[in-house]
Amino acid sequence: MPEGRRVLILGGTAEAVGLATKISGSWNVTYSLAGRTRRPSLPENVILRTGGFGGADALADWLLENDTDRVIDATHPFAHRIALNVQRACETAGIARLKLVRPAWKPVPGD
């Protein structure tokens, strides 16, 4: 496992699994799921965490207790509550946050 840099990826999307896999060679990755999705296939060195954090304050505490350097919010686009909690937690803990945003859907012939 790489030394130093720790990232929490809040997953639940295919993009999140791909991202965790891609960066697991250079970051210590913890991949978090709400528990409502099936277990993803992740590299052995990625830590899987299942279940909620208990709100923004508890998430901020978790980030600090686990020496987290970065947070990537790759949750489902409609997961508004967790997205807001992640934003607040990162602001409280002083940790940089990246929000993965999917491109907007555009209709194509046959839709």
Question: Predicted segment positions?
Answer:
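N-terminal beta-loop-helix "entrance" segment that forms/cooperates
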Residues: 30-54, 108-111
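Glycine- and other small-residue-rich loops at beta-strand/loop junctions that grip anionic moieties
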Residues: 8, 51, 75
